[in-house]
Amino acid sequence: MNDIVRIGPGQTQQSTTKFVGISVDERERERALRERFAIFWEAVSGEPRAHYDEFISASPLVGDVDLEAVDADRVRGWWVRPRHPKPGQAILFLHGGGYVLGSAKAYRGFVSQIVSRAGIPALVVDYPLASEATLPAAPDAAKAAWRWLVAQGFDRIAVVGDSAGGGLSLVTLAELIREPVGAAPTAGVVFSPWTDLAFTGASMKDLTVADPLIGYEYLQDCARKYLGAADPHDPLASPLFGDLRGLPPLLIQVGTDERLLDDARRYADLATLAGVSVELEIFEGMHHVFQLDVAHLETSRAALDSAAQFLRNAFDGR
């Protein structure tokens, strides 16, 4: 479905919303995957960060990328590079985990799936986690990574992230429009972004939402740890409440079975009204950040193919 939204006198902006259905076989694969999720998390005890990294690391590392650790100028993380990258192009990837979990190392496999498809190198950043570090530590780290990429000579950079990292990606893009560093961002791609830490979306509290991975109470706890004394309506925490004018082209992907469904839909609507080119893809029956499950779901592979094509088009100026 293509909607033309009028922004002002003489101006129009196209917003594309695509609903992707799934087959009966894919629905069964999703059901089996949810059973495996339940078994994994029921067996978890001890340090949650180690278990989360184990869970994320199940996304397979592709064979045609190179890995390199980064620890320089306040920037820590990993390079995930294709064998033949184009000069000057890069992805800044910000991982999920509710701002309390996750690491660049654990996300290398997932990011390799994007890099291999798009042919664009990605810097996967380790940013400070809560509750040890609160807002604005994560946005500051993301902007430091952007500055580092610019200093390394990259002049075509997209920002990509999932879940909390998706929200952080949108925060980072808005900050870079407000205070530019180098060339303007090329594009943004976010998977199941957490855009509203004030929890005003209907799907967040909807008891009929069958999200197998994240619950309302869990996200509330993550938000408390991350916000510290900050207002949840602060755009540095919740990009939904920020100034969205001037953002680069955006691709937003989300599943129907998500607490964060309305976080994605409302952000897409507001960005479109602000004059941003937005592609929103909603996937039937899919759980939170289903793209990670590329080894199990055809829908995950199709979503990553779409994201890679979006990035290539943005970098090629199409």
Task: Please give the residue ranges for each predicted region.
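A glycine/proline-hinged amphipathic helix-loop "lid/cap" segment
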Residues: 1-83, 316-318
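Alpha/beta-hydrolase superfamily serine-hydrolase fold, recognizing
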Residues: 39, 62, 66-318
